[in-house]
């Protein structure tokens, strides 16, 4: 008996020693299969809907979830059950994660957060085990919210081949589908998930009964951008006379995360300059930093290069101003930036712009060719400065023909499909090689036509081109008001 007791004691000592060396009970070996979900317990000081600006439609959709978590009985009395899952879809930086936290904050319930990539492990079966553990914890804490960020990491469409795909990822997805089937809509566990690749998700995951509701979280419009700027401006010391509407118009197409970065950059610039608060100029400069990078202070152009860049930028602005339905010129500069731009012309729409006519798109192509056209008109030569303009003009002309049906030859036939619309919109042609050759010819003809229009506009307004270029050369940066004052001067 005594030798047996001694043997057990020695075994326990060795076991404790091994656990210490491996990091104790919290080590990887002893935590396999645990979800590692970040749990934010309910708190009255959490993120609320008031902290999320610019996404009114998404908030309206999610308010019903909050009401259910507050008072589920009124839904149960009528026999209604909440959606088991809500899928938040939209471009990066639009506030999908923040909205999910705001739902939990408004409902004052626990919030389990986990990224899709955290489920996939090197050991087969660990991902499925983590899913089981996550849902077990959620049911114990119900009512609560489970949030899976970047769900496309585990929710991608399964391959049709017998041996295709990632076995571990597919097992994890299968377990997630099983868990979502395993509880009713009245259990008090709401699953929120976010993705910017909804088209890649498995149909079994997005069908009714699993993710019943899809909530788009799009880029904010003008009013949304203004509201977001005001929310983030509360976090810094800022001048009282800041025109947030103007800043919002200048930041067209910016996401909520980018707008937050713009406000923060303005505060950092104020500190660098030794001021106690940020100003309108700080915010405007921050937008330019996001668009074109920081000013390149050590870049010194020759006088000849500076003249070329001045004419190039005035060429853009003059062609834009001489056409109808073009966005007003906000600013023109020939100060080099870290993005590689030696100068740029900023145009800002007066309000929201949801549609573009064929004429407007052609005018935009003409404006893009205006820089090169000015070089040809004045110097009789061309430079590499128009490389980005050429790329944008070609892309726009191709889209007119292949996607928007603005070609008489092809009429309303889609020649191009867009994939990953929330991640830049990769395109692929869906036509024969002969048709592709015809498309190329029409793209060349369209850009050439607008280039010739730009050349004519600049030739007809050569005196103003010279006067404005000389003014820009001297000042280096001019406002849209200064540009229009000289242009309209008799």
What are these regions (language model features)?
Residues 1-43, 400, 422-424:
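Long amphipathic alpha-helical segments used for membrane anchoring, targeting, substrate engagement
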Residues 83, 306-310, 317-490:
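Soluble catalytic regions of large protease machineries
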Residues 10-12, 16, 272, 289-296:
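Hydrophobic alpha-helical transmembrane segments of multi-pass inner membrane proteins, especially
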Residues 18-24, 74, 146-147, 151, ...:
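Proline-centered turn/helix-capping motifs that create local helix->coil transitions or kinks
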Residues 184, 203-204, 217-284, 293-296, ...:
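Conserved C-terminal "switch" segment of AAA+ ATPases
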Residues 34-42, 105-110, 152, 196, ...:
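Flexible hinge/switch segments at interdomain interfaces of large molecular machines
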Residues 297-308:
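Short pre-active-site segment immediately N-terminal to the catalytic Zn-binding motif
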Residues 37-248, 254, 266:
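Walker A/P-loop NTP-binding motif of AAA+ ATPase domains
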């Amino acid at each position: 008996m005594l030798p047996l007791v001694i043997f057990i004691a020695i075994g326990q000592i060795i076991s404790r020693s091994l656990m210490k060396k491996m990091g104790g009970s919290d080590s990887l070996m002893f935590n396999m299969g645990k979800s590692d979900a970040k749990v934010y317990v309910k708190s009255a000081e959490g993120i609320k809907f008031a902290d999320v600006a610019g996404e009114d439609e998404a908030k309206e959709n999610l308010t019903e979830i909050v009401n259910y978590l507050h008072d589920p009985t009124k839904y149960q009395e009528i026999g209604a059950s909440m959606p088991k899952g809500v899928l938040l879809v939209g471009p990066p930086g639009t506030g999908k994660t923040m909205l999910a936290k705001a739902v939990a904050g408004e409902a004052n319930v626990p919030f389990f957060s986990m990224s899709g990539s955290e489920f996939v492990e090197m050991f087969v079966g660990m991902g499925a085990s983590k899913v089981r553990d996550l849902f077990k914890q959620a049911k114990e804490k119900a009512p609560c919210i489970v949030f899976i960020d970047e769900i496309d990491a585990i929710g991608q469409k399964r391959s049709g081949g017998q041996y295709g795909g990632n076995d571990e990822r597919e097992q994890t997805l299968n377990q997630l589908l099983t868990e979502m089937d395993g509880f009713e809509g009245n259990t008090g566990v709401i699953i929120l998930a976010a993705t910017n690749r909804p088209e890649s998700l498995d149909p079994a995951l997005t069908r009714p009964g699993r993710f019943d509701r899809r909530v788009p979280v799009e880029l904010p419009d003008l009013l949304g951008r203004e509201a977001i700027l005001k929310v983030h401006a509360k976090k810094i010391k800022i001048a009282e006379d800041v025109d947030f509407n103007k800043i919002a118009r200048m930041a067209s197409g910016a996401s909520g995360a980018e707008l937050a970065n713009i406000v923060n950059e303005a505060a950092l610039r104020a500190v660098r300059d030794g001021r106690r608060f940020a100003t309108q100029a700080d915010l405007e400069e921050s937008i330019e930093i996001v668009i074109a990078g920081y000013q390149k202070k050590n870049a010194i152009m020759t006088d000849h290069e500076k003249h070329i860049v001045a004419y190039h930028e005035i060429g853009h602005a003059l062609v834009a101003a001489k056409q109808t339905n073009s966005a007003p010129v906000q600013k023109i500069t020939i100060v080099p930036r870290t993005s590689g731009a030696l100068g740029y012309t900023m145009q800002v729409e007066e309000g929201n712009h949801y549609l573009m006519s064929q004429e407007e798109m052609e005018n935009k192509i003409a404006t893009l060719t205006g820089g090169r056209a000015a070089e040809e008109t004045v110097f009789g030569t061309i430079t590499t400065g128009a490389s980005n303009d050429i790329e944008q003009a070609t892309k726009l002309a191709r889209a007119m023909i292949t996607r928007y049906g603005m070609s008489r030859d092809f009429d309303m036939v889609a020649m191009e499909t867009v994939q990953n619309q929330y991640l830049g919109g990769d395109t692929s042609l869906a036509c024969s090689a002969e048709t592709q050759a015809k498309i190329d010819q029409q793209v060349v003809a369209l850009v050439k036509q607008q280039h010739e229009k730009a050349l004519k506009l600049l030739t007809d307004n050569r005196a103003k081109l010279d006067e404005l270029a000389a003014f820009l050369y001297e000042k280096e940066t001019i406002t849209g008001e200064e540009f229009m004052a000289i242009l309209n001067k008799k």
